[in-house]
Amino acid sequence: MADWKLRRQILRAACFLLVLTGLLAVYIVYLTTWDADPLAENPLNARTAAARADIWRGSIIDDKGNVLAETGSDGQRRYPYGEVMAPVTGYNGDKIGSAGIEAHANRELLGLTADMGRLGPISQLLQADRGNDVHLTIDADVQQAAYKALQGRKGAIVVLDANTGGVIAMVSLPSYDPNNIESEWKALSQAESSPLLNRAVQGLYPPGSTIKPLIADEALSTGTVTESDTFDCTGSLEVGGGQTIKDSSGEVHGRLNIREAIAESCNYTFGTIGMRLGDEKLKDAFHRFGFDREIGGDVLMTKSHLPEFGKLGRGDQAQTAIGQSSLLVTPMHMALLAAAFANGGTIMKPYLIDKVVTPGGVTIASTSPTVWLTATTPDMAARIESYMAGVTDHGTGTAARVSGITVVGKTGTAENSSGKEHAWFIGSAEVGGRRAAFAIIVENGGSGGRTAAPVARLIIEALNKK
């Protein structure tokens, strides 16, 4: 009897050890496959840190060959464009870690791939003493022009190649100088102006009237409104519950159709359309254009904050349709909205890294343009684009016009609970051999037509110099 009990205990122990060994094997497989890249990139990984100390970090280069970040002869990281390019390059510090392309392309800049990192000490023998160069889609000249156009005002600018998704410029103000990031870290991290916040992809703002092209697309696509329908704008729309939506400066537009309402940015018309659409169609509109989704890749964009569809009253439906209520979006996503209409209804996934090149000049990785979403039909995209052409031709955005170039757009003046309205302008132009889409926000800038549209003109002129 005693022998039988002993054998049973041994059997149980053996089974337990067998299961434990199996679980350990599964975990090791997981670590060496699915979780390998995060482990290799973890700043606490001593092996990666040791390799980093021995490697001459590669350069970050724009689409024309201009150096945006490099390692000097003293081993210190240098950023020739300083705060102009900080929202793109980010920084790389011994004590504070890294951000931007410096963080996202850390492995490439070190020439230390995750596969080599898994080789352990052997990787030290195979590793070159200089990392790879990372080439971006950014145009330093356009970036500088956009930075200068903001004239030191808080805000953000995004410029995209609508046909590929390549980011041409990404500006955020206030900014910081990555050359001095470690010595100024405490002051920067505590500053009320939030210079470390990349407003282009992390800043959330009410879009104001720049959202109206999306609303028009949904209204026409679903048959909720036709081009022949007219609205009698009295300058003030009662939406129930004691709420009233007014047009800018108390303007009364009279009778107009949806095309004219885009050009004149009529709140009465779009508030009415919002209530006709209702929660489900409004939700569908924002879903089709990706406002409820994350993108991923090397453009780390904060997801939009959408109203709680399904629980909105008529007032919030109307407010959402004019870009207010609880709706908050990033400048990057508004540039993608403009790009959708410029690219026949297709939104390309935005990206910054064009290619990775070894010290010997061999391209070891390159980015191919990728479709992110098909948001609307080519016919509808062309129709909305024609409406936006009216904005710059004779509507609220004439200040964005550039002689000899077709510019389309939409202005926005977004109410802001903490101060003066934000000025917006989104749009696109066929310029410099490509279709460029853009979004501009000037915090507390007031009228989008008077403040943001002239910024668009300066950017288009810079693109035209290519």
Label every model-predicted segment:
Residues M1-W185, P195, L204-S209, T224, ...:
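Periplasmic/cell-envelope proteins involved in peptidoglycan metabolism and beta-lactam response
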Residues R7, K64, N163, V167-S209, ...:
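Beta-lactam-recognizing serine transpeptidase/beta-lactamase-like catalytic domain environment
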